[in-house]
Amino acid sequence: SHKAFKMPKWIEYYLLFFAHIAMFGPAITWVANHREHHKYVDTEKDPHSPHYRGWLMAYAGQVLIDIDFKLVRDLLKDNLHRMQVKYYWHVVFVYAAILFSINPMLLIYAWLVPAGFAKLIGSLVFTYSHRGKKANSDTWVGIITLGEGFHDKHHVNARTALWHPLDLGGQLIRMIDSNAKIQ
């Protein structure tokens, strides 16, 4: 969402698929929300500020609000990203049906619980790592969320990966960078 690096399309689409089935909403929606969040951190215009819009918006705001498509013109050029917006819920329901048909417990324990936990991590970060108009680092949230609580560093320089050894997102970017030659 910060255009910090460019990765091969096959890796982008691979990650897009897993973000899709984790129910984070279409990538276009997530990126637009994140870019808007950086524009309006913890104000009434912040799309997922728990302080102005409530905890539910921090938890599931990516799939509950309308977005400004002008913020994601770069992603709208990509056919797969546009298809993901159009068929988002179709894929979610088909995936759920496949898991349920294999074993109903897969639907709950291999999908809904992990997806819900991932969203819980995000909402914890937005609830406890933002106070006032400034993002803060919170060591305990950082430890519990494997790096997501070190949020002030992200707001100081959003294009920098790896702010802390526990930052798994930064570790993933570094791994992709060394293995896939991100330009």
Set out the residue ranges of the language-model regions.
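Non-catalytic, topology-defining segments of multipass membrane proteins
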Residues: 1-124, 128, 160-183
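Active-site-proximal inter-transmembrane loops
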Residues: 132-157
